Amino acid sequence: MFRLYPNCSLPSHRPLVFLPRLPSRSLRCRAAADIPLGDGIRLPREADSTSDTARSRDVSVAAGGNGEGAKWRKRRLLWSKSGESYLVDDGDALPLPMTYPDTSPVSPDVIDRRLQCDPVVEDCREVVYEWTGKCRSCQGSGTVSYYKKRGKEVICKCIPCQGIGYVQKITSRTDIEVMEDLDNEPS
């Protein structure tokens, strides 16, 4: 039996204290065994930590194997923080619309008539040029990158071109000889 103050030679009126002999690690684990650390991770209890099967069970729970951790693991797998976009699963590119919704493209003879139109004789509609050019957001690559608050780079699919790299461009300017000149102009 151990007294509370073994070096004291005076008789004590305090009762003797019996302390169980435990390793320091298990004493700390016992004190925090019922407190969850977050996201389904729990420290092993003293009775569980003695056997190897209990240790493997605790590791599987900590990794999200069963119970409360399963929901966390599922959520973690659905949205991984590897820097990939949730649009990365698309196998094929979406079709690129060349006209506005619910309209049909202008035929070449209509464009020729508009070009030959004389504004003195008739009311002429302006010629509208449509072409496909590189996306300005992703520079034709289909992916863009941005940085989060803490400086971590995130790469995802370009939204304006839907990951294709090219977009429909339209203008009513008449001083254009080559449509690609517009792509090379500084903005």
Curated annotation (Swiss-Prot):
Tissue: Expressed in roots, rosette and cauline leaves, stems, inflorescences and young siliques of light-grown plants, but not in etiolated seedlings or in senescing tissues.
Superkingdom in the source lineage: Eukaryota
EC number(s) per entry: 5.3.4.1
Single GO MF descriptor: metal ion binding
Membrane topology according to the record: Peripheral membrane protein
InterPro entries: SCO2
Region (Disordered): 41-67
Record-level GO cellular component terms: chloroplast; chloroplast thylakoid membrane
EC category: isomerase
Subcellular localization(s) per the UniProt record: Plastid, Chloroplast thylakoid membrane
Keywords: Chloroplast, Isomerase, Membrane, Metal-binding, Plastid, Repeat, Thylakoid, Transit peptide, Zinc
One Gene Ontology term from the biological process aspect of the record: chloroplast organization
Main location as per UniProt: plastid
Cofactor(s) needed: Zn(2+)
Stretches for region CR-type-like: 113-175
Summary of the knockout phenotype: Albino cotyledons but normal green true leaves.
Subunit: Homomer. Interacts with LHCB1 proteins, but is not part of the signal recognition particle protein targeting pathway.
Identification of the protein by name: Protein disulfide-isomerase SCO2
Classification lineage: Eukaryota, Viridiplantae, Streptophyta, Embryophyta, Tracheophyta
